[in-house]
């Protein structure tokens, strides 16, 4: 509780740079390689995706592995990005009657399950979220054993496995928190 929207905040922060790749450069590197990238957060997962020529697969995997473990957290950048997300919330939800209705419906329909909270987060949680919260979330959940790598296109499976091992293989697994089942009470 109190951290609704944290996954979405991390999605934004994942483009702010590592020791190896300065802030804002991730997308530029992909673009210079002839590709495009983006990300989105849903209720169950966050997706980071690149679309580029198969000859650039190693580049994409190297960049993803780097930001999985080497993300740089700047307090200034975090505050700036939180303001962007709060404005995004105002524009997409607070100023949109249909979005407000949908948000209220989910909060009513789900009494116990996390689906009751908006992906973007409640404004009060965003206003009170700190850099340490984001760092803890990143250090807890961003790990190869909590990641699904999907590669599709004209590629050889052996090449994908080899490159995935090369870039992600040295990243240690993390002990993930035990997830507790969220059982909804009967509704009448």
Segments from the language model and where they lie:
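Bacterial peptidoglycan biogenesis and beta-lactam-recognition machinery
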Residues: 15-18, 69, 74, 155-158, ...
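Active-site SXXK
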Residues: 5-18
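Non-catalytic accessory/assembly modules
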Residues: 76-80, 96-103, 155, 162
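Non-catalytic, conformational "gating/processing" segments within enzyme and secreted inhibitor domains
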Residues: 82, 132-167
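Divalent metal-coordination and catalytic microenvironments
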Residues: 8, 48, 64, 85, ...
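Non-catalytic beta-strand/loop surface segments
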Residues: 1, 20-56, 92-146, 170-188
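Hydrophobic face of alpha-helices
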Residues: 7, 23, 27, 61, ...
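M16/insulysin-pitrilysin zinc metalloprotease superfamily fold
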Residues: 16-20, 51-82
């Amino acid at each position: 509780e109190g951290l609704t929207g944290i996954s979405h905040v991390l999605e934004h922060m994942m483009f702010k740079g590592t020791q190896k790749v300065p802030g804002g450069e991730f997308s530029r590197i992909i673009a210079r390689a002839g590709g495009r990238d983006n990300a989105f957060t849903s209720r169950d997962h966050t997706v980071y995706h690149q679309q580029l020529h198969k000859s650039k697969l190693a580049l994409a995997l190297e960049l993803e592995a780097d930001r999985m473990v080497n993300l740089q957290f700047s307090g200034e950048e975090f505050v700036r990005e939180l303001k962007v997300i709060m404005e995004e919330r105002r524009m997409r939800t607070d100023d949109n009657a249909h979005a407000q209705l949908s948000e209220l419906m989910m909060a009513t329909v789900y009494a116990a399950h996390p689906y009751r909270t908006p992906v973007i987060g409640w404004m009060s949680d965003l206003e009170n979220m700190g850099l340490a919260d984001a760092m803890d979330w990143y250090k807890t959940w961003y790990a190869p054993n909590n990641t699904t790598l999907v590669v599709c296109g004209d590629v050889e499976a052996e090449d994908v496995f080899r490159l995935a091992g090369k870039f992600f293989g040295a990243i240690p697994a993390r002990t993930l928190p035990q997830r507790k089942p969220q059982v909804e009470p009967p509704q009448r």
